Structures are given as C-alpha cells and as structure tokens.
C-alpha cells in the first residue's frame, strides 16, 4: 500500500469505501476500493483473491481497468483506473425536462454491450449492473465497473452502510430464485438501464423482491409456463401471484424510437433462453445509423 496515497473519500460502494488516490511514483490518479466483508474475522477468502486476480486480465476500452490487488492489515484493496463521474450522477445532473441526445443514448448502449460481450466471451458475468457502476468520461466513453465482484464476494443484501442493494435492474429469474442463471441476467439489466438512460427514470423501481417482480409483471403480464417454460417450478414462484395482463412498453418508456423499443423488448424477454444475446443486440437495426468508427472498441477482439 506504500505505493499509493489516499487523497479523499469519494463514495461508498456495495463492498466498502472508495477513495480517490494517487500512485506515488507516477502521479497516476486511481480509485481505491477498500473491501469490507461480512465475516471479517476470517480474513479474505483465498477464492475471492483468485477470482479478483483473474479480473486483471479483463482489458477492454469499455471496462474499468483493475490495476492492482493489495492486502494491508488483512484488508483487501482493489486499485482501479479513475473516472470521476458515474451514469447515475450524470443523469441526475441533467435539468428537468431535458434528456440525453438520442445518438449519445445509442452510443452508450452500444459501448455497454461491447464491454459485456467481451466479459461473457470469457465466462465472466457481472450480475449487478446498474447506473452507479457505469462510469463515464468527458469524451462520451462509458465503462463497466465492478465486474466479477459479485462472484468473488457474493451480492450482499445490504451495503455495509445498511443501505439496501437496489433490485431495480435485477432479472426476473434471479428474483424468482433461479440458481442456474447465466449471461442473460446481464442483458436484462442492460435493457432496464437503456430505458433509464433515455427517459431519466427507472423502468421498474420496486422496494422489495416481490414488489420488483410485481412491477415487471404489471408491464409484461404475470409470467407462466406458457411464456416461460418451467418458470412455475422456480423456488420463489407462487401460483397466488396476481394475474396481470400486461401493458405497453411504448406507454412506459419515453424518448426511445420504434427500433429502440423493438430492441428493448427483446432484451426484456421473460424467458432467459429467448432473451436476445448481447452479441445479437449489437447487430440490431437500432444501431444502423451510429458511427461506430469513433468508438473506443470499434474492433472487438475475442
């Protein structure tokens, strides 16, 4: 830890305090995440350290780079490249009645998908995507942060400050207790984030797991085996759920054109097996008029 100096506390993440810091030798500004774990007496599990070390290999222009993993007094510090603004703060800063330019919405979504494809190709899920862990710079680049941390540390029910971890972006299969979920959980989250980038308000803002599920059901109709084979056998599915018929996506999401709504609907399909993949989403006509040559990862390398 002697190589780095803390400058100031900049926030509290899911797993602990985040500081702005500096690498003393080079002057590089970094983000330092101090990880606090539920059962701290036992120290940091070696499995977590192994998982985290693998994340150093996730190098892509749309993924926040993990520069270093350090231990000090049995505390784990993750050192990341520093970006000063997250998507949530940015959306909150836009004056009432104003929205992001349609082309910037499109560019952000395309870049988020590029980042997720890179990780999914390496069998790394995010599991906890939300506007707070999408970081942006002043040049229109967006990067995914906190990749793989959910697998290394688990997703706690509460942030260590006792603030409840948000459920707004969580896929229905996770809410219903599926243990065999995969890459489609991230696509669902990205769909809900897409709607929020365009309209500046969360698409489904439940305050508990059941409320979250009901808000999704009000829009899409209550899921059953007909639309989603075997959903009724998931552990948290109840036959007593209210039977909603479902409404219209266009009525609930503002500032997205017809092509965008078509893509969004495909990202929010109930059945994970029928939900569009991130790779297929990139080929959707919604992106036809986006100038991809200027994007930082315009050549995706697998």
UniProtKB/Swiss-Prot annotation:
Top EC class of this enzyme: transferase
Compartments, record wording: Nucleus; Cytoplasm, Cytoskeleton, Microtubule organizing center, Centrosome
One Pfam family of this chain: Pkinase
Claim: Transferase is one of the keywords in the record: yes
InterPro entries in the record: CDK (IPR050108), Kinase-like_dom_sf (IPR011009), Prot_kinase_dom (IPR000719), Protein_kinase_ATP_BS (IPR017441), Ser/Thr_kinase_AS (IPR008271)
CDD domains documented for this protein: STKc_CDK1_euk
Modified residues (Phosphotyrosine): 15
Binding residues annotated for ATP, in chain numbering: 10-18, 33
Domain of life: Eukaryota
Regulation of its function: Phosphorylation at Thr-14 or Tyr-15 inactivates the enzyme, while phosphorylation at Thr-161 activates it.
Summary of subunit composition and partner proteins: Forms a stable but non-covalent complex with a regulatory subunit and with a cyclin.
PANTHER family noted in UniProt: CELL DIVISION PROTEIN KINASE (PTHR24056), CYCLIN-DEPENDENT KINASE 1 (PTHR24056:SF334)
Name recorded for this polypeptide: Cyclin-dependent kinase 1
Gene name, Swiss-Prot/TrEMBL: CDK1
């Amino acid at each position: 830890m002697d190589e780095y100096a803390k400058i100031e506390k900049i926030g509290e993440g899911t797993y602990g305090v985040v500081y702005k810091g500096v690498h003393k030798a080079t002057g590089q500004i970094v983000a330092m995440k101090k990880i606090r774990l539920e059962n701290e007496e036992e120290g940091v599990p070696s499995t977590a350290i192994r998982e985290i070390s693998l994340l150093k290999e996730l190098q892509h222009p749309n993924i926040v780079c993990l520069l270093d993993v350090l231990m000090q007094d049995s505390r784990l510090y993750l050192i990341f490249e520093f970006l000063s603004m997250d998507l949530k703060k940015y959306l909150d800063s836009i004056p009432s009645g104003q929205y992001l330019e349609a082309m910037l919405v499109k560019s952000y979504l395309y870049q988020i998908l590029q980042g997720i494809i890179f990780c999914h190709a390496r069998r790394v899920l995010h599991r906890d995507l939300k506007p707070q862990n999408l970081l942006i710079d002043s040049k229109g680049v967006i990067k995914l942060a906190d990749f793989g941390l959910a697998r290394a540390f688990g997703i706690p029910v509460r942030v260590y400050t006792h603030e409840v971890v948000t459920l707004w972006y969580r896929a229905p299969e996770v809410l219903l207790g599926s243990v065999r979920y995969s890459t489609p959980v991230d696509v669902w989250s990205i769909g809900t984030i897409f709607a929020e980038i365009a309209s500046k308000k969360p698409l489904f803002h439940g305050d508990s797991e059941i409320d979250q599920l009901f808000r999704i059901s009000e829009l899409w109709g209550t899921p059953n085996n007909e639309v989603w084979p075997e959903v009724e056998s998931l552990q948290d599915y109840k036959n007593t759920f209210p039977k909603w018929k479902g409404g219209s996506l266009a009525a609930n999401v503002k500032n997205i054109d017809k092509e965008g709504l078509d893509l969004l609907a495909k990202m929010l399909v109930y059945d994970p097996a029928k939900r569009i993949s991130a790779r297929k989403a990139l080929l959707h006509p919604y992106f036809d008029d986006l100038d991809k040559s200027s994007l930082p990862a315009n050549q995706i390398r697998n």
